[in-house]
Amino acid sequence: MPPVSRILSYAPRVAIRPSSQLARPARAFAVGTVRYYSAEQPEEPLIRVTDLPAPNSGHIRVLELNRPKARNAISRALLASLREEVHSIARQYDAQTGEEIPTPSWNKRFGGIAGDSEKGPTRALVLASAVESSFCAGADLKERRGFTQEETNEFLANLRSTFAALDALPIPTISAISSRALGGGLELALCTHFRVLTSNAIVSLPETRLGIIPGAGGTHRLPRLIGLGRARDMIVTGRAVSGAEAYFLGLADRLVEVLPPDEQEAADTTDKDAALLSAAREAALTEAVRLASQICEGGPIGIRAALQAVQAPSQETENKMYERVIGTEDRNEALKAFAEKRKPVFKGR
């Protein structure tokens, strides 16, 4: 048997199941169009793109970082790829209101009113890794050693603007971390609404040990998430934090416990560590997609309004968002479904 995993969220106890029984969402559907963002085309895309059907309408988009030889370190090419993927989702929604941009042809065919493909609008985004040993190792320091000061400034500006664009997406965003997320890798995960970590995951902001500080949002996004004292501890010491501690700190929203095989099982496994990393990556991605699907069971307009309301909490914001949802077709459908004792079918209108 492979390593065992179990999901720890807000429930005190849950069932344990072998990772081989977990769904394999990334392999069950065809990968979307391959996109390249550098003059020299790599053997594989720097980001694997998979669209999974979302409940009600649209799709859940899965982006898997794919630079195995560099542990997904962020190079200029990978950053350009990520920026285009984020912007392709952002273009489906109004930058000011977060509402879907009307596209009647998709509305007619898929029930939503946005989207740049036949799969309809993107309802949620999962950011994961195609590399078992690393979620993201931060900036590509080997590449940056050859930068001029001007090139360094340009790279940082692009990095910060891309992270800000990810942070500003109006749909639910989830990071699936099953190994190491260091420096800019953790800062990338901090830009998503939710983070799913496995018990063997390691996260850190080690920049002070390199004589600098986090420069892509870590010093303001981390304190906002886990509090000033805890964030200061992580940033100033640069220490590594396990998945379990990250869950305790509030950095992880879901913790998937991955247990190593016992001695008998290990004897049948040529590389126990590789088997554990593989099981962990699959378990984290499965739970992230499950969370995305669970969220997408709700009304798309209501979900986006709720995200906006809690992002800038105030009575004024809540009132404004409530006014946005109260007169929608989805709201009427929910009332009708309740009366008819069935699940509502939301269309994002």
Curated annotation (Swiss-Prot):
A Gene Ontology term for the protein's cellular component: mitochondrion
Alphabetical GO biological process terms: fatty acid beta-oxidation
Mutant phenotype after disruption: Exhibits a reduction in growth rate and an increase in the number of conidia. Reduces virulence in host rice plants. Increases tolerance to NaCl, KCl and sorbitol but decreases tolerance to SDS, calcofluor-white and H(2)O(2).
Location in the cell: Mitochondrion
GO molecular function terms attached to this record: lyase activity
Alphabetized UniProt keyword annotations: Branched-chain amino acid catabolism, Lyase, Mitochondrion, Transit peptide, Virulence
Transit peptide, UniProt annotation: 1-37
Alphabetical list of InterPro entries matching this protein: ClpP/crotonase-like_dom_sf, Enoyl-CoA_hydra/iso, Enoyl-CoA_hydra_C
Pfam family membership, one: ECH_1
Family: Belongs to the enoyl-CoA hydratase/isomerase family.
Its biological purpose: 3-methylglutaconyl-CoA hydratase that catalyzes the fifth step in the leucine degradation pathway, the reversible hydration of 3-methylglutaconyl-CoA (3-MG-CoA) to 3-hydroxy-3-methylglutaryl-CoA (HMG-CoA). Involved in vegetative growth, conidiation and in the stress response. Controls mitochondrial morphology and mitophagy, which are critical for the infectious growth of the pathogen.
Protein name: Methylglutaconyl-CoA hydratase 1, mitochondrial
